[in-house]
Swiss-Prot record:
GO terms for molecular function: damaged DNA binding; DNA-directed DNA polymerase activity; magnesium ion binding. It is found in: Cytoplasm. It comes from Nitrosopumilus maritimus (strain SCM1). Poorly processive, error-prone DNA polymerase involved in untargeted mutagenesis. Copies undamaged DNA at stalled replication forks, which arise in vivo from mismatched or misaligned primer ends. These misaligned primers can be extended by PolIV. Exhibits no 3'-5' exonuclease (proofreading) activity. May be involved in translesional synthesis. This is DNA polymerase IV. Its EC number is 2.7.7.7. GO terms for cellular component: cytoplasm. Disulfide bonds: none annotated. Belongs to the DNA polymerase type-Y family. Gene3D superfamilies: 3.30.70.270, 3.40.1170.60, 5' to 3' exonuclease, C-terminal subdomain, DNA polymerase, Y-family, little finger domain. InterPro entries: DNA/RNA_pol_sf (IPR043502), DNA_pol_Y-fam_lit_finger_sf (IPR036775), DNA_pol_Y-fam_little_finger (IPR017961), DNA_polymerase-Y (IPR050116), DNApol_IV (IPR022880), IMS_HHH_1 (IPR053848), Rev_trsase/Diguanyl_cyclase (IPR043128), UmuC (IPR001126).
Amino acid sequence: METRIVFHIDFDYFYAQCEEIRSPELKSKPVCVCVFSDRGGDSGAIATANYTARKYGAKSGIPIVFAKKRLEERKDAVFLPVDFDYYSEMSEKAMKIMEEFSDVFEYVGRDEAYLDVTKRTEGDFHKASHLAQQIKNSIREKTKLSCSIGISPNKLISKIASDFQKPDGLTIVSPEKVEGFLESLKIRDIPGIGKKTEQRFTEMNLETIGDVKRLDVFTLNKEFGRKSGTYIYNAVRGIDDELVKEREPSIQHGKIVTLKKDSKDYEFLLENTLELCKEVHEIIQKKNQMFKSVGISFVQSDLSNKTKSKMLRNPTMSLEELEKTVEQLLREALENQTATIRRLGVKVSELSESQGQRDITSYF
C-alpha cells in the first residue's frame, strides 16, 4: 500500500501580503490590516500584520490602539481596513492553481487548503518535494503570493509542518521522521489545543509533546474526557486517519438586482435590499452554511462602484441578523451619497458549515 502524502498549504500573512502586492511600496513598512468596529476612531482589532509589524509586537487579534502604541516609533506604519472582495479574488486564483496539482483538494479557508497528492507522487516524498516547489513557483508566478507548505503522511502533521519555516517555507516530515519532529514541540502546537488545555498540562509539569506522550490514554480520558483525551493521545503520536475531503471554495454567496429606477432614497433601496437578503438566505439554508461577513454593493448611475462590508462577532445563518446588518450598512453607505444607484447587491462570505466537525477546543 502506498504511503499517503498530504500537503497543507498556508498563505503567509495573507491579507497584509495581498496589500503589499497591490501596493509594492508597503513592503518595507509595518502593515496592519484592521477590522474596524462601528464605534468609530481606532476601535477594532488587527486581522493580520506583516512580519515587519510583528517584530514590534503588532499581531493578529490585538486591539488597533495597542498595535499603534507598539508601532509608535515607526512613523511609516500603515493601518488599512480589510478588503474582503480583493482578498477573495486573490484567494480564488491561488486555489484554482492548487487544485490543478492535486488528486483531492480540500478548501479550508481563504488562506489555506489540504491536497492529497498520493497518486501523482506515487507515495514518494522526493517527488512530493518537487511537486510542492512547482506549486509554490506557479502561485508566485501567477499571483505573486508566497505560501508555506507542510508535507507528511496526514493532515495533522502537515498542518503543524506548514507553520514550521514561515514565511515561504517548505517542511517535509516523512513517516520515519514523525516521532522526532513532534518530540520537542510545545503541546500548544497541536491544532485544537487551547490555552486552558495547555495550562492544565503545565500544572502537570508537562510542556512538550514528548512529555505528554508519556501519559496513557486512560489518564488523558480521565483528565479531558474520552473524545478529547483520545484525540490528544493519537495526536502526540502523529496519528491521524482523517481523509482529505473534496471541498472547493465557496467563498461567497450574493445576489444583485438592477433597480426599476435609479435612486438614492433609503426606503426604496431598503425594500429592494431586504428582498435580496431573503434570496441570499435561501441559498445558505440550502447549503447548510453559516456566514461571518456581510456586504452590500452599489453600481451608481455613473457606473462607478461602491461597497461596504462588516465582519460579525460570530458565524450565523440568521435571516434577522443578515437583515439588521444590511440595514446598518445601507444607512452608512448612503451618508453623503450624491450619485443615484442603478444596481444593488447583497452578499455573505467567510462561510462555514453549520453542522460538522467541531474544533477540539469546543469540548474543553
